[in-house]
Amino acid sequence: MSGRGKQGGKARAKAKSRSSRAGLQFPVGRVHRLLRKGNYAERVGAGAPVYLAAVLEYLTAEILELAGNPARDNKKTRIIPRHLQLAIRNDEELNKLLGKVTIAQGGVLPNIQAVLLPKKTDSHKAKAK
């Protein structure tokens, strides 16, 4: 034979996404496309979308993990914007990162000024005597 054709050639390997290669859940291909279309730079390296997707995935996991605590405290199984607000505002670093962000339906942190709290008096002791 002259060696033409595909008689004994290897089968092509199954396609593997860049997200699965990097061990991520966030879409590396989509992040790469958005970086190219966003006119952030003339060229985008191969490692940049992987790194950015990993950072976004980490931040999302961190916020959702912290938001699960207020949800559990309120005996809820679904995280709502209020739980996200409480999680972010009670965490020092996340609050600094998202300080200027307004979360719709998030509400405010419960806070009562010390001046407005009722004063502790000795009336209890006077009544006991």
Swiss-Prot record:
Gene3D superfamilies: Histone, subunit A. The modification N6-(2-hydroxyisobutyryl)lysine is found at residues 6, 10, 37, 75-76, 96, 119. The modification Phosphoserine is found at residue 2. SUPFAM superfamilies: Histone-fold. InterPro entries: Histone-fold, Histone_H2A, Histone_H2A/H2B/H3, Histone_H2A_C, Histone_H2A_CS. It is found in: Nucleus; Chromosome. There is a cross-link at residues 14, 16, 120 (Glycyl lysine isopeptide (Lys-Gly) (interchain with G-Cter in ubiquitin)). Residues 7-19 have a biased composition (Basic residues). The modification N6-glutaryllysine is found at residues 96, 100, 119-120. The modification N6-lactoyllysine is found at residue 10. The modification N5-methylglutamine is found at residue 105. Core component of nucleosome. Nucleosomes wrap and compact DNA into chromatin, limiting DNA accessibility to the cellular machineries which require DNA as a template. Histones thereby play a central role in transcription regulation, DNA repair, DNA replication and chromosomal stability. DNA accessibility is regulated via a complex set of post-translational modifications of histones, also called histone code, and nucleosome remodeling. GO terms for cellular component: nucleosome; nucleus. This is Histone H2A-III. The nucleosome is a histone octamer containing two molecules each of H2A, H2B, H3 and H4 assembled in one H3-H4 heterotetramer and two H2A-H2B heterodimers. The octamer wraps approximately 147 bp of DNA. The modification N6-acetyllysine is found at residues 6, 10. It comes from Gallus gallus (Chicken). Its main location: nucleus. Keywords: Acetylation, Chromosome, DNA-binding, Hydroxylation, Isopeptide bond, Methylation, Nucleosome core, Nucleus, Phosphoprotein, Ubl conjugation. GO terms for molecular function: DNA binding; protein heterodimerization activity; structural constituent of chromatin. Monoubiquitination of Lys-120 (H2AK119Ub) gives a specific tag for epigenetic transcriptional repression. Following DNA double-strand breaks (DSBs), it is ubiquitinated through 'Lys-63' linkage of ubiquitin moieties, leading to the recruitment of repair proteins to sites of DNA damage. H2AK119Ub and ionizing radiation-induced 'Lys-63'-linked ubiquitination are distinct events. Phosphorylation on Ser-2 is enhanced during mitosis. Phosphorylation on Ser-2 directly represses transcription.
